[in-house]
Amino acid sequence: SYIYPPEVANVKSVLNTIKTLWIDLYTAPELGGDKFLLGKNPLKIYMYGGRNVDGNGMELLDNLEATTNEMFLYNVNEFNPQDEDKVFILMRSVHHQFARHLMELFPYDRSKFLSISRNKYIKSTKSIAWIFKGETQGRRGFILAGYPNKKGFFTFHSLLSPEKDFAEIISLKLTYGPKDLLQALDRAKTPYNAGSDK
């Protein structure tokens, strides 16, 4: 990881963006309403200047050692609210982490969900590290991608655990359009074969 303090100049831009694309979204009258977030927000939001990369080279959406009562925002120093990719990466992380938090407040049937892909989850990113070798931009780890799609998942993060898988479903519905999600589901109809494209 490249964890160091964020540049103060970017903190306000990040906060304004997450207010508009997270808080305002969930409190919109047609969704949760103005009281929806009461008692549901993370207790703390931590910001870091650099990326959150694990020992295998994969950039992560969250802090593996933290509780869901805390939200961790990375790459603040590179954030630019005019850059669609930077906003996309930030909001994928925010929506993923908040979905995990909501999963603890509104329990889902984990056993039933686990039965869908029980033997397909991976314990470590080591087996997919080859995909991220030389990756410098980060976005690749956060997108809908053929490799996980063909294994029955939306993203690389979905492969890591049932909780991440469930959170990814929510995060993706908030950051992608229906057409993109349908294309991923269509790719999932063709199982992955070693040696095929990523």
Where on the chain are the PLM-derived regions?
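Auxiliary, metal-adjacent structural segments of Zn-dependent hydrolase domains
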Residues: 12-70
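Catalytic Zn2+-binding segment of zinc metalloproteases
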Residues: 97-115
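Non-catalytic architectural context of zinc metalloproteases
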Residues: 1-13
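Structural recognition of the beta-strand scaffold that forms the well-ordered cores
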Residues: 44-47, 70-74, 166-173
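Active-site scaffold of zinc-dependent metalloenzymes
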Residues: 48-95, 104
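Solvent-exposed, polar/charged alpha-helical surfaces in well-ordered, non-transmembrane soluble domains
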Residues: 12, 16-20, 92, 96, ...
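A generic secondary-structure signal for well-formed alpha-helical elements
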Residues: 22-29, 102-106, 174, 178
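Metalloprotease/metallohydrolase-associated module, dominated by Zn2+-dependent proteases
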Residues: 122-197
